[in-house]
Amino acid sequence: MPDLKTMMLNFGPQHPAAHGVLRLVLEMDGEVIERADPHIGLLHRGTEKLIEHKTYLQALPYFDRLDYVSPMSQEHAYSLCVEKLLQCEIPIRAKYLRVLFCELTRILNHLLNISSQALDVGAMTPLLWLFEEREKILEFYERASGARFHAAYIRPGGLAADIPEGLIEDIAKFIEQFPKYIDDVDELLTENRIWKQRTVGISEISIKQALDWGFSGPMLRAAGLAWDLRKSQPYEIYDQLDFDIPIGQNGDCYDRYLVRMAEIRQSVSLVKQCIEKMPEGPIKTEDRKISPPPRAEMKESMEAMIHHFKLYSEGYHVPEGEAYVAVEAPKGEFGVYIVSDGTNRPYRCRIRAPGFAHLQALDFMAKGHMLADIAAIIGSLDIVFGEIDR
């Protein structure tokens, strides 16, 4: 009998199921995957290096462009890290608004992931339904910050501006009618025979394996570990809000889908609580060395004009030191580590992207599965190459 050779198959980088610019070299034994080798770096833009040449405020928009489907979560991590170095306390209204928008961002991210994961295995309807709801949330982004995606809204010292009149009421209206659409998708997918055949038992992973690979977020919780930074290391006002941590049992593609569906419902509840408890007051720190003065003040005071000019030309100087802050981003633990040398620019900024750890386990998760399952596995990882390649 002649020697049997495995076949090498290139998957991507132009493949629609690759979720961006993933090049995957698959070693196949017939239809079965023997090895999956992800080639990353096709979207590398040198973000961490670029940040070293910008002031602390100018570095902020780079974070929107990392995981570009959940931008505000990353701004949040960066702002918290800079505030930790500055030892700056922000007003309570700013904290509530930050949490409100971070939870809307979580909904935004999970809607995209669930609908595209369903599309990858052949279900088109959820995409058409859920993108309609995403559009409404992007409109809230636009009304608050002026941009649909790259908001640059959460800034060190507070927020860019207060929300316009009527926005809170419109978010409240949206949150009331939104669960109906989630119920519709739930009905369409959760007990669907074909959906379950494509996702149940695919790339199962245990808690120990998930921790060994550095998983976080829904990927870790789907394996059965109730680890959520909003509960275990509360930041902002999460310790004053009431929510549950949904977990899975088997750590397979189906459980990851269920965890994300449950997280959307928890985020809806958190948004409602933020709206009910929303206090009045300022939205940025009063420290004029960090946050710009109000427009009205600049028309009357020369001091205010000088502060404004200095802030936007030179930027503020951050005390020497280092800080690491992680937030529970929709994809997992998103961390920012900044080393400051006392100047107006970060000496070093290291970004911990959750998707990076998830993608490195792809070989382990895909081994022994069929070629058709690779689309379901990649869809369940929820990877975006902006943050992986940085």
UniProtKB/Swiss-Prot annotation:
It comes from the Bacteria. Its main location: membrane. The keyword Hydrolase does not apply. It catalyses: a quinone + NADH + 5 H(+)(in) = a quinol + NAD(+) + 4 H(+)(out). Its EC number is 7.1.1.-. Keywords: Cell membrane, Membrane, NAD, Quinone, Translocase, Transport, Ubiquinone. One of its GO terms (cellular component) is plasma membrane. It is a peripheral membrane protein. One of its GO terms (molecular function) is NAD binding. The keyword Membrane applies. Pfam families: Complex1_49kDa. NCBIfam families: NuoD (TIGR01962), PRK06075.1 (NF004739). Belongs to the complex I 49 kDa subunit family. HAMAP family: NDH1_NuoD (MF_01358). NDH-1 is composed of 14 different subunits. Subunits NuoB, C, D, E, F, and G constitute the peripheral sector of the complex. This is NADH-quinone oxidoreductase subunit D. It comes from Wolbachia pipientis subsp. Culex pipiens (strain wPip).
